[in-house]
Amino acid sequence: MRWTAGILGVLLVGLLVLPWLVRPKGGSQPAGEGPALVIITPHTEQIRFEYERAFSRWHEANFGQPVTIDWRAPGGTSEIRRLLIDQYRAAIRNGEYELVDGEVIIEPGRMGYDLLFGGGSYEHTQMRRGFVAEIDGQGVQVPISVPAGFSQDRMDAWFGENKIGNQLLYEPDQYWIGTALSGFGIIFNKDLYARAGMDTPTSFTDLTDPRLMGLVALADPRQSGSITTTFDSILNAYGWDEGWRILREMAANTRYFTSAATKPPLDIAAGEAMAGLAIDFYGRTQAQAVTSPGAPPEASRVGYIDPVGAVYIDADPISMLRGGPSPELARRFVEFCMTEQAQSLWQFSANPEQAGPEPTGPVQYELRRAPVRRVMYEQHADRFIDRVDPFAAAADVPSRGWRSAIPVMMGAFGVDSDEELQEAWAALWRLRERAAEDPAWTSVLARAEAAFYAFPTQAVVGVDGQSRALLFSEEHYDAVRDVWRDAEAAAEARIAYTRFFRDRYKEVVELEARSQPD
């Protein structure tokens, strides 16, 4: 209805222009004595509760007064990024800035948020890059975040080497600083594996086992940044050919592709799927939810693992935002996040009385996340709920830069072709069994294998103005990716790719249906 669309449009404008109207469902509001800090976050209510309580207590002990936090939780990190960019663009259009030596300066209090707390390093890096604004007829880069400004000695004391696997723990200029670590691994139902007589998974390749047809739960990489990160880690660890093969076969085993990365852990715990991919704390939290009170974590029917040497470990950062209301208070919150007390909130058991030596851990909620500081593993690992060491598990393979291909290709060969893919996968395995019994089928199998794993070509215009059909391959990846930078060309490519994959899967099914070999 038109009147409904109009109302929604007004509400959207209000959301962009008046950030103080945004409130998390069930979130806390500024109340009580002391200053207030405004934090926009994708973090859960449990994390918000523990960090607000602990920070206020720390601030009162160190600065003489408690603090309240005004949490804003409008959605996931991708949604938050879009919201912030819109608000900062509006501020530039309204002239709420000064241009000093080519840098955009926004005075404290001009913008609505002090900090972005949580989300992966990719999104926080986008905050550091910001956007390009046209000012006085020129394009000027406007970072949304600002450097935290701690001394390098302080950073070295907190982090030591600025590295985990192939990733940074903090942005070198401190536009973002990691506060926790996120792994992207495998969640599985132990009971279902036992009933099937299968060993529980230890590597990503285990999710390609044909016995898992229709039993793997995955999120849609076009909707979930976390699952894209997991798929990217597989490509990085296994390389182009083997990596894409694993992703194709994993997609062929899916029960579904969901838009919500939180759904697979729930369904796996309920026995609706045997295994899937998840962020570590989604997996561990769900395992805890189905564990009997007082039972150890290993007693849960749900398990989670980070495949050693292949898992992508990413910093979960915090960023100070340009023009926020209280920059000094925001900086204190960042400093607090790096204390051992704050780090203990991520992985210690709940301690309602806050008894025992510091750090004392959370009061109510067990967050089941990995601390970012090495000292926690060196001195306090015996107090962890989960016996984890992400520094040992992290893959040390340099990023190959293929992430942008994942939503495009998996969307085409998996999500939008799921029925055809699954039918072809089952047919391919029947052919493999047939060829194993009768070598006369070997040539037919080879053709089916080639069709199943095939990739399309892309028309690319070279510097000479000539159009060439380039195979989507490691060699031609950069050229093909450049085509996708144009929105219209990218949309046409996605349609063509989907048609290509469906035709190839149909070919596999037809080859298997033959009554005679070549």
Predicted regions located by residue number:
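Hydrophobic membrane-insertion alpha-helices, especially the h-region
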Residues: 5-20
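Long, charged, low-complexity terminal extensions
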Residues: 370-518
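A bilobed periplasmic-binding-protein/Venus flytrap-type ligand-binding module shared by bacterial periplasmic
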Residues: 187-192, 313-327, 345-346
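Ligand-binding pocket segment of bilobal, Venus flytrap-like solute-binding proteins
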Residues: 233-300, 304, 344-345
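Small-molecule pocket liners
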Residues: 182-185, 232, 302, 314-318
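Extracytoplasmic ligand-binding site segments that recognize negatively charged/polar headgroups
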Residues: 42-49, 72-74, 78-81, 112-260, ...
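Mature extracytoplasmic/periplasmic domains
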Residues: 321-397
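Early extracytoplasmic/lumenal segment of secretory-pathway proteins
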Residues: 19-129, 265-266
